[in-house]
Regions:
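Short beta-strand/loop segment that forms part of the nucleotide-sugar
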Residues: 17, 41-52, 69-71
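Conserved donor nucleotide-binding strand/loop of the catalytic core
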Residues: 47, 58-87, 91-94
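Acceptor/aglycone-binding surface of glycosyltransferases and processive sugar-polymer synthases
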Residues: 72-88, 99-102, 110-185, 212-222
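Short, well-formed alpha-helical segments that are part of the catalytic scaffolds
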Residues: 22-37
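Donor nucleotide-sugar binding loop of glycosyltransferases
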Residues: 22-25, 53, 110
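A conserved acidic beta->alpha catalytic loop
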Residues: 50-58, 107
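Alpha-helix termini
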Residues: 35-41, 88-97
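Hydrophobic helical membrane-anchoring modules
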Residues: 1-11, 180-239
Length: 239
């Protein structure tokens, strides 16, 4: 695992970016995050969780000036992001911890929207804010998302429109309650259920975000099949 040196300043916000083979988008995502929080006067620490990418993602991350936590092998999203989250856990165990943001590496320039999640948390609207995409980008027939929505309802009674959105912000106190994240694509369902069961309030904020869509292609359907398998496993693990 590689990690660049952390900021010497205590951050107001810590952003953990999940990435796998995102060399073409990760620099734009990091730059958008840094610029957006700087405009709000926030000291931000950006940590990229690289799930052992086979392209130049790790190199691009360091060139962009973010910290890098690289998985020693491909662990899946939940496992790789857990490694990065453990790097920042000491910060959230201190008094007045920073807000923690989670996002995907393929947001590119639309990552400038994420401070609105932090604002929702700071305003006391919720303890865990989940971004709901205001426009649909690609995707399949909604089977995997529908299952995820129903699983969360069954496990903790919440009704979410964006149950597997990876764009989230949380009070620092929430992070220890949801780490380690559920394996692979079960990460977001597990996080939501664990936070709700720990007594934290989960809310949604509509944002105008875009990401790399898989679409109704063979590759897309295989991807959603893997997602659905992980969704079933995370539901079974939390019954």
């Amino acid at each position: 695992m590689d990690a660049a040196s952390a900021s010497t300043h205590r951050p107001d916000v810590v952003v953990i970016v999940s990435a796998f083979n995102e060399a073409d988008r990760i620099a734009a995502t990091v730059t958008a995050l840094r610029d957006a929080f700087a405009r709000d006067g926030e000291e931000v620490r950006i940590v990229v969780a690289d799930d052992h990418s086979t392209d130049t993602t790790a190199h691009v991350v360091l060139e962009a000036g973010a910290e890098l936590v690289r998985a020693p092998r491909n662990l899946g999203k939940g496992g790789a992001t857990t490694l990065a989250a453990r790097e920042v856990l000491p910060l959230v165990l201190e008094p007045d911890p920073p807000v923690v943001v989670l996002c995907d590496g393929d947001l590119a320039d639309t990552a400038v929207q994420l401070p609105r999640l932090v604002q929702a948390v700071r305003a006391g609207e919720c303890d865990l804010a989940v971004a709901a995409f205001s426009r649909r980008v690609g995707g399949g027939f909604g089977v995997a998302v529908g299952y995820a929505r129903a699983a969360i309802r069954r496990l903790c009674g919440l009704e979410l429109t964006a149950p597997i959105s990876g764009q989230r912000a949380m009070r620092g106190e929430v992070l220890p309650a949801v780490v380690p994240f559920a394996p692979r694509f079960g990460m977001e369902i597990g996080m939501t259920v664990d936070a709700a069961r720990a007594g934290f309030r989960v809310g949604e904020v509509e944002l105008d975000l875009t990401h790399r869509a898989t679409g109704r292609t063979l590759k897309g359907f295989l991807h959603r099949g893997r997602q659905l398998k992980d969704f079933v496993l995370v539901e079974l693990s939390r019954r």
